[in-house]
């Protein structure tokens, strides 16, 4: 894989020349006017990296959901119904006074019935207590076989002593799945299997370092360590050629993003409803467009793709949005790496500083949580910062960020249209049609949106849907998604060379762009959050 042509897999098969026509010089009108023949939809769906990310993620989700579904007791509904009917029956048959009688007779009857009534009440209470103490807990049978290195303080072996079998399980699943996908796409499965153990070992090392208790307290997440591990290798001894078949940055991250779609449930938007939607969906596009305009017109950043990726990274939701946008605008690996580095650095700073600022300003937890959710890039960092302010702030912050995450697909789609229609179009040439926009559109976004809709429906309308979906996510797919992201960050580091990155840092313009854009984001998000949560919908969201 050549780091200078990272987009060859983003929207077309590997055996088709996707970039030569799109990236032709402005003077080559014939190339722009007559693009090469595009592959058929069937061939695209069987060889394209984006489509295979969807197929791989869909297979994993199907297996994960089926495992939880099959693991239910056959008589679960009967147990629940029987328990409920028993409680109701006991309450209804509890002895009561027979009716009016003489005063002395009533006293005698009351005395006789006191003990049975108390016993009946005690039985009902005990039944309810047992039901409360021993409810059926949905769990994924796959959970013991899927794990990541755990937390450790002094002894590094503590991180893997209890999770090594789960780590091995993840390795075998991803190795087998991606080897098969590579073979079907016309690549060498053997070359992938020879290199993948090293990439996976580096990802395990990143997880292991992030699990150290002091490191964890500062929320220095695995993504940062994975990048550093890869960068150290690529910028010192260099990335060995034999590793390149397993350095599949886009494939890993796209598969992880499709898995993420199952976690972004539309039904959960109702938790905050319109206030959160206004904060996330009105401010975000304004900040993105304004920041991109500022980078082009004021800072005059040479690379439009770098400008766009940084703008999306900062305004939408960090790394996931950066990668989706990079696929849509065909950004270079170095540009994506720079954007992610800026995002991770400022995420750590904002996660530590913003809760203190909110407390010092006397902002209440609801408003503070909404501010955190709309500004901090990483979902994990949002949750960590919200937890500092309390459970109420955590709930609001996480929900606003979840609402904002839905814009990943929308952003990628809009950027793809803008890029094909305006950025790469020759003004003297013919207007690019819908087919070219479809060809350039990152198809994995369709998987992200489809999984979000599908599992939202299952969550809302299926019997025991919330329990089933939560068990599936918590017991398997969330762990796999984390591994895919970690493998992607290791790959980004291995493909990034600082010598190629330095020209992009000339004059510090990317840093200035990020700081200015984030400053605008902070101001607009706070204003909108105040209007929505404290003025317009104050009664609705009041605790």
UniProtKB/Swiss-Prot annotation:
Specify where the region named Disordered lies, as residue ranges: 1-41, 91-120
Task: Tell me where on the tree of life, at the top rank, the source sits.
Answer: Bacteria
Composition bias, Low complexity: 1-22
Pfam families for this protein? Cons_hypoth698
Cellular localisation: Cell membrane
Annotated membrane topology: Multi-pass membrane protein
Q: Which GO terms describe its cellular component?
A: plasma membrane
Is the keyword Cell membrane in the record? yes
- Main location class: membrane
Keyword annotations for this protein, in alphabetical order, are: Cell membrane, Membrane, Transmembrane, Transmembrane helix
Q: Which residues cross the membrane?
A: 51-73, 160-182, 189-211, 221-243, 270-292, 307-329, 336-358, 368-390, 403-422, 437-459, 479-496, 511-533
Q: Does the keyword DNA repair apply?
A: no
Q: What PANTHER family does UniProt report for this protein, alphabetically?
A: INNER MEMBRANE PROTEIN YEIH-RELATED (PTHR30106), UPF0324 MEMBRANE PROTEIN FN0533 (PTHR30106:SF1)
Task: Tell me its family.
Answer: Belongs to the UPF0324 family.
Name the record gives this protein: UPF0324 membrane protein RB9488
Organism, by scientific name, is Rhodopirellula baltica (strain DSM 10527 / NCIMB 13988 / SH1)
């Amino acid at each position: 894989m050549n780091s200078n042509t990272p987009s060859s897999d983003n929207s077309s098969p590997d055996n088709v020349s996707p970039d030569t026509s799109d990236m032709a010089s402005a003077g080559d009108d014939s190339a722009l006017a007559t693009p090469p023949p595009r592959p058929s939809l069937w061939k695209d769906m069987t060889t394209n990296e984006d489509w295979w990310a969807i197929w791989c993620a869909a297979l994993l989700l199907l297996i994960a959901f089926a495992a939880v579904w099959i693991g239910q007791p056959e008589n679960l509904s009967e147990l629940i119904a029987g328990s409920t009917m028993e409680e109701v029956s006991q309450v209804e048959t509890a002895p009561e006074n027979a009716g009016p009688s003489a005063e002395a007779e009533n006293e005698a009857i009351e005395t006789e019935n006191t003990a049975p009534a108390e016993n009946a009440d005690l039985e009902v209470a005990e039944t309810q207590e047992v039901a409360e103490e021993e409810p059926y807990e949905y769990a994924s049978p796959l959970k013991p076989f899927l794990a990541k290195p755990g937390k450790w303080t002094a002894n590094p072996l503590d991180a893997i002593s209890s999770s090594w079998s789960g780590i091995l399980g993840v390795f075998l699943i991803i190795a087998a799945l991606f080897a098969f996908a590579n073979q079907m796409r016309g690549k060498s499965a053997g070359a992938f299997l020879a290199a993948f153990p090293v990439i996976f070992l580096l990802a395990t090392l990143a997880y292991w370092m992030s699990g150290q208790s002091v490191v964890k307290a500062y929320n220095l997440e695995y993504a940062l360590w994975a990048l550093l591990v890869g960068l150290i290798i690529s910028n010192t001894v260099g990335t060995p050629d034999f590793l390149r078949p397993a350095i599949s940055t886009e494939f890993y991250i796209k598969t992880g993003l499709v898995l993420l779609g199952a976690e972004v449930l539309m039904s959960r938007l109702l938790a905050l409803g319109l206030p959160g939607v206004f904060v996330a969906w009105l401010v975000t596009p304004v900040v993105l467009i304004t920041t991109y305009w500022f980078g082009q017109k004021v800072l005059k950043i040479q690379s439009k793709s770098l400008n766009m990726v940084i703008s999306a990274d900062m305004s939408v939701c960090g790394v996931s949005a950066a990668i989706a946008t990079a696929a849509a605008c065909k950004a270079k690996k170095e540009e994506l790496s720079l954007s992610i580095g800026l995002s991770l650095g400022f995420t750590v700073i904002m996660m530590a500083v913003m809760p203190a600022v909110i407390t010092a300003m006397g902002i209440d937890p609801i408003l503070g949580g909404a501010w955190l959710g709309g500004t901090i890039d990483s979902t994990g960092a949002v949750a960590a910062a919200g937890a500092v302010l309390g459970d109420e702030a955590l709930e609001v912050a996480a929900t606003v960020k979840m609402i904002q995450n839905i814009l990943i697909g929308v952003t990628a789609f809009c950027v793809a249209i803008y890029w094909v229609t305006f950025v790469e179009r020759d003004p003297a040439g013919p207007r690019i049609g819908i087919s070219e926009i479809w060809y350039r559109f990152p198809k994995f976004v369709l998987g992200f949106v489809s999984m979000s809709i599908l599992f939202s429906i299952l969550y809302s309308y299926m019997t025991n849907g919330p329990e089933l979906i939560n068990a599936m996510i918590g017991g398997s797919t969330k762990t796999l998604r984390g591994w895919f992201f970690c493998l992607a960050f290791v790959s980004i580091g291995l493909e990034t060379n600082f010598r190629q990155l330095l020209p992009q840092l000339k004059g510090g313009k990317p840093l200035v762009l990020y700081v200015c854009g984030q400053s605008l984001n902070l101001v607009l998000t706070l204003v909108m959050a105040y209007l929505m949560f404290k003025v317009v919908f104050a009664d609705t969201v009041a605790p």
